[in-house]
């Protein structure tokens, strides 16, 4: 279910403080965050955010196409193991 328009997009306060501080100092150094639920704002474009996926921090470079999405969408939490090509059991009919 989508978030109500009257509430506006969500971003954690500590994350917004980090972004405004880096923008005021004109720095683009990467920083860590556990806030996967925060929405990407236009102020964040050009920054590299290290998003926690439950095990490690994944670097996410933010560009214009990511605005409006959540940070967690770009840091996968599950590892995909490719399907085995020679699996005889699955090939039976």
Swiss-Prot record:
BP terms from Gene Ontology: ribosomal small subunit assembly; translation
InterPro entries reported in the protein's UniProt record: Ribosomal_uS19 (IPR002222), Ribosomal_uS19_bac-type (IPR005732), Ribosomal_uS19_CS (IPR020934), Ribosomal_uS19_SF (IPR023575)
Signal peptide interval: none
Gene Ontology CC annotation, any one: small ribosomal subunit
Keyword NAD: no
SUPFAM superfamilies linked: Ribosomal protein S19
MF GO annotations: rRNA binding; structural constituent of ribosome
Family that this chain belongs to: Belongs to the universal ribosomal protein uS19 family.
PANTHER family given in the database record: RIBOSOMAL PROTEIN S19P FAMILY MEMBER (PTHR11880), SMALL RIBOSOMAL SUBUNIT PROTEIN US19M (PTHR11880:SF8)
Protein name per its UniProtKB record: Small ribosomal subunit protein uS19
Annotated organism of origin: Leptospira interrogans serogroup Icterohaemorrhagiae serovar copenhageni (strain Fiocruz L1-130)
Gene from which the chain derives: rpsS
